A protein has these predicted regions:
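Alpha-helical transmembrane segments and their immediate juxtamembrane cytosolic regions
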Residues: 1-359
Length: 359
């Protein structure tokens, strides 16, 4: 079944909104909250940091939301090409190549060229994206059956839940959710090469990579609804919102016995993240692609996020390599005394945006 292959503007804007907080938005809120006149921002500033271990804040959503959006694009990219006659084998090789590139970029991001490979951390944000996308995209490419895709999603949910809840770890038993006794730590120590960032486990490790593919597939099903369903745009947004609310409810109900922990990528964390991601996607899709709300100022805001969203991996790597804040300080350092450190961060965001705009 074919459908529209046009790229949804809301996807790029939502991805840009997501990346904005990583490249400086979160730090800007935190710095502004330190000003006496803006102290009311302190509760929001807390949301701009990760929880220490168990629980959930807004900033914990950034990574899984990106994964979810990557899944949403599959019907618009891979399936669109398959419909045009591109061989599945060629598409599969493209997915594998992309995964390898992301893994390599992740290793470079971790400082392979700077520090060498001795005591190097191989697990990375980009590596997890690459592996999880490889799993999700391969499932979609190797079968046209939606039923098969659903079964694979269910299998991943059951596999990770079973591992984390019921598989005993030698010396400790089953059902531990901590950095030492859990199945994540055990498998990372046995299978993951290099340094583990937390000593006994890595929050981007073996179990996490497989678990995160659930978000890719969840996004894929949302993408199928958006691209292929004959429902009206409003109905699509409503269905996504309802599904999102249901996933959030499931996560909260299960959380007393299956904790919401980002560092372990527990399935309750995935349910909660996917649920919020669905609601955000529904909101952005409804406002931008269905209602097409315009206005000069609003259009500029959308364009601001769209530029970031179209260059997400580029800006992620660039912020690691280019000292944007030091460049900003060169131009705005004289304003720190009268205004505060926030002006440096704001200047860095502006420089980053124009860097992407002129690429």
């Amino acid at each position: 079944m074919s459908g529209k292959s046009e790229r949804l503007m809301s996807l790029d804007v939502l991805r840009g909104f997501d990346m904005f907080w990583i490249i400086g938005g979160a730090s800007l809120i935190i710095q502004l909250s330190q000003l006496e006149s803006l102290s009311f921002l302190k509760p929001l500033a807390i949301q701009m940091t990760h929880v220490e271990f168990e629980g959930f804040r807004f900033y914990d959503l950034i990574f899984p939301l990106f994964m979810f959006i990557s899944g949403v694009t599959i019907p618009y990219s891979l399936l669109s090409k398959r419909e045009k006659g591109v061989p599945v084998k060629k598409l599969q090789m493209h997915v594998i190549k992309r995964a390898l590139i992301l893994v390599i970029f992740g290793i470079l991001y971790n400082g392979a060229l700077q520090k060498g490979f001795a005591d190097l951390r191989y697990a990375s944000v980009l590596g997890l994206i690459g592996v999880a996308y490889l799993i999700g995209a391969t499932i979609v490419l190797q079968s046209k059956s939606i039923r098969t895709h659903v079964l694979w999603l269910a299998f991943i949910v059951i596999l990770i839940s079973t591992l984390q809840l019921f598989i005993p770890v030698p010396g400790y038993g089953a059902g531990w959710f901590d950095p030492v006794k859990g199945i994540n730590a055990y498998l990372d120590q046995k299978l993951l090469p290099g340094r583990l960032v937390s000593g006994t486990f890595d929050r981007l490790g073996i179990v996490c990579m497989v678990s995160a593919s659930m978000l890719i597939l969840s996004g894929y099903f949302a993408g199928r609804l958006l691209r292929f369903s004959k429902l009206s745009g409003s109905r699509k947004a409503l269905w996504m919102s309802a599904a999102g609310a249901l996933l959030i409810l499931i996560a909260l109900i299960l959380s007393p016995v299956y904790p919401i922990i980002k560092n372990l990528w527990t399935m309750t964390f995935n349910f909660l993240s996917a649920g919020i991601s669905l609601i955000l996607l529904a909101l952005f899709y409804y406002v931008i692609d269905v209602k097409k709300i315009g206005g000069k100022v609003f259009s500029k805001i959308l364009f601001f996020f769209q530029v970031i969203g179209l260059n997400s991996i580029t800006i992620y790597m660039a912020t690691r390599i280019i000292p944007f804040r030091e460049v900003s300080r060169f131009f705005t350092g004289w304003l720190v005394a009268p205004l505060g450190e926030w002006i440096i961060i704001l200047g860095a965001i502006v420089i980053e945006w124009y860097f992407l705009y002129f690429l």
